[in-house]
Design a protein with these regions (language model features):
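Catalytic glycan-binding domains that act on GlcNAc-containing polysaccharides
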Residues: 1-147
Length: 147
């Protein structure tokens, strides 16, 4: 399936704005959403570990809590992570807006890369939560498609 040229250009610009390798960002997008800006996935284990305590302690309402337990958009940014990194829009579903989701996702990926000392494999493992040891290899194998 061909990639929408507008989405590709948006991804390249978002990567450039954060000083990231555009090919790496595009590979993450392909791995995470297959270039579907409307992709979303409820992550029950993430919800239970990171979000449920906020809801249980009345820090957030039910709708906000469940939205924080969903990965959204092209880069599949977790709602909770987006909130922690300053995404203050009223609705987390705005992460499905390609420009918004890519900007937030690239900012988070840059932070992960900095924390990993510039090592893309370690940054990708952190991006994915470390649960899938093959994730970084799968993404890095896709990078060449975007060079």
């Amino acid at each position: 399936m061909p990639i929408d040229a507008k989405l590709l250009a948006l991804a390249q610009r978002a990567a450039e704005a954060e000083g990231l390798d555009a090919a790496l960002v595009c590979a993450v997008v392909e791995q995470e959403s297959g270039w579907n800006p409307w992709a979303m996935r409820y992550e029950p284990a993430f919800f239970a570990k990171y979000v449920a305590p906020l809801y249980t302690n009345n820090k957030v309402g039910a709708t906000e809590a469940y939205a924080r337990g969903i990965s959204w958009g092209l880069m599949q940014v977790m709602g909770q992570t987006a909130r922690e990194k300053g995404a203050s829009s009223l609705y987390l579903s705005t992460l499905c807006d390609p420009a918004v989701g890519l900007a937030v996702g690239c900012r988070i990926l840059r932070q992960k890369l900095e924390a990993a000392g510039g090592d893309p494999a370690r940054a990708l493992l952190a991006w994915n939560g470390g649960a899938n040891a093959d994730y970084a290899d799968e993404v890095l194998a896709r990078v060449g498609r975007y060079r």
